[in-house]
A protein has these predicted regions:
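The alpha-helix within a helix-turn-helix
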Residues: 19, 30-31, 60
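Short, basic-rich loop-to-helix N-cap that marks the start of a DNA-contacting helix
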Residues: 47-58
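DNA major-groove recognition helix of helix-turn-helix
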Residues: 44-45, 74
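Short C-terminal boundary/hinge segments that cap the last helix of small helical domains
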Residues: 64-74
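Residues within the helices of the helix-turn-helix
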Residues: 16, 27, 57
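A short, Lys/Arg-rich alpha-helix, primarily the initiator
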Residues: 1-24
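Short alpha-helical DNA-recognition segment
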Residues: 23-43
Length: 74
């Protein structure tokens, strides 16, 4: 069986869209997550890194979506 893999760039782009659609700014979401260095958020949005599971759960709550709605697979 072949399992899907997470597409970091697609997930980052999707995350950006979800943040904008929620009416929050990227900085607002970063503050809600307690992220001191905003470069972390931008790494996620560019697809250079993925949020850890704790931040992914928090993002799903902040954005009122499921984790599966944030992730893009290929």
């Amino acid at each position: 069986m072949i399992y899907p893999v997470i597409d970091p760039a697609g997930t980052g782009s999707n995350l950006r869209s979800l943040i904008v659609s929620s009416g929050n700014s990227i900085a607002d979401v970063g503050r809600m997550l307690g992220i001191a260095d905003m470069s972390t958020m931008y790494k996620w949005l560019r697809g250079d890194a993925l949020p850890g599971i704790d931040n992914m759960l928090s993002l799903s709550i902040i954005l009122n979506v499921s984790i599966n709605d944030i992730l893009v697979t290929k």
